[in-house]
């Protein structure tokens, strides 16, 4: 199981979200860290950004990188703003 680390910007965004959304995001990342190969995770690589992946959680997008040992969350944003 990979360790999940959050950037300062990601933590700030997480603290501003409603508690139920925060819980969903954390649960989804725990599921991803436990079984990254599962198709239920709905993870895709972003085009144009080397090594950056996105995880869908409802209307929210979580952008992150992974090296097998550590999953580093870069950004958490609403669907429309996540790719700017």
Residue spans of the language-model regions?
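Enriched for short, Lys/Arg-rich terminal
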Residues: 1-12, 16-23, 27, 53-61, ...
